[in-house]
Amino acid sequence: DIFGHSFTVFIDPDAPADSRYRATMSIKARHGYYTAHSADGLKWEYDQLVPQWRSNDVITSIYHPGQKRAIVALKVRPYPSVNGIPRRSIGIAELRDGRWSEAHSALLPDELADTDAVSRGYSCGDYYGMGMMPAGSGTVGVLWQFRRSDMMHGVNDVTLVYQAGRGERWEHVPGRPDFISHADPSFGQGTVYTSSCPVMVGDEQWLYFTAYARIHGWYIHKDKEIADKRMQTVIDEGLSRIGVARWPKWRLFGFRSDPKGSLTLKLDGIREPSRLLLNYECEQGGSVRISLEDMPGRTEE
C-alpha cells in the first residue's frame, strides 16, 4: 500500500481501532518524512499526502507507554552548520492525542564529538540517526556516531544517550564510550545502523543492527558519482549482515559501588501502591542496604 526508506512501525494502544498501527518513513523523491496508519499492520494509508516533516533520510519512532506518546527521531536537513561545517544532527517530534508535533533540534554534534572523531583518525563527528528505548519515565537513545573523513565517507559507531523525562535535555553517558563499535562484528566491520528499538526476548533485551562490510559511501566518489567497480564488489560480496546486541533485561545502565557508595532514587508521581524491584549483584562479602529517606526507620539489608 505504501513505500518508504527507514520504515518504522509501532503500535499506539491509545489510538482508534483504524489507527492502532502507526508508521514513519522517508520518501526522498517527495523530499520529506511521512506518517501512516493501519488497523491491522497490513493495509496502510498515509496520514496525509504531503510531508509531515520537511527533511529526509533516517527516521525512527517508538511508542513510550510511560509518557503516553510516540517519539520520533529524525535526521535534520538541510544540515545545520557547526563551526562553518554542515553537520548531520538529530531532531525530535512526537505523537500525542493523535496529533503529530513539529520537529525540533535535540542533538547537535559538539566539540567532544569532534575530539573523539579526530582521535580515531577522522575529521569530525556527526549524528547520523538514533534508535530509542522507553525506560520508566525516561528514554534511552542509541546514537549513531558518524565519524567521517569527508562529507560522504566514514563509519557509524553507537553510543548511549538518555532523556530523564519528556521535554528535558538529552544527555550523553559520561565518557561517551562505544556501546557498539563498527569494529566489533566479525561479519561486517564497515559501519553500524541499529533498529528503532530493542525487543524483549525472555530475560534479555535484544537490539538488532545492520553491519556493513564497507565504510559508509565506499562505492561513491567524493563528487557523489558511483564507482562502478566498487559497486560491483558490493553486489558480489553483499552489502551488509544483520546482528544483535543482547543484555539482561533492564541492565543496560548500572551503578557500581566499589568499595562503598550510595544511590538515591527519586520516585515521582506514584499514585498507587507499588513495588520497588532491585536488580543487583553482590560480590563475596558485599551487601546492599535499602532505606526510605522520608521514613528513617524503614531499613532493609
Each model region followed by its residue ranges:
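Beta-rich carbohydrate-recognition and catalytic domains
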Residues: 1-125, 133-189, 202, 206-301
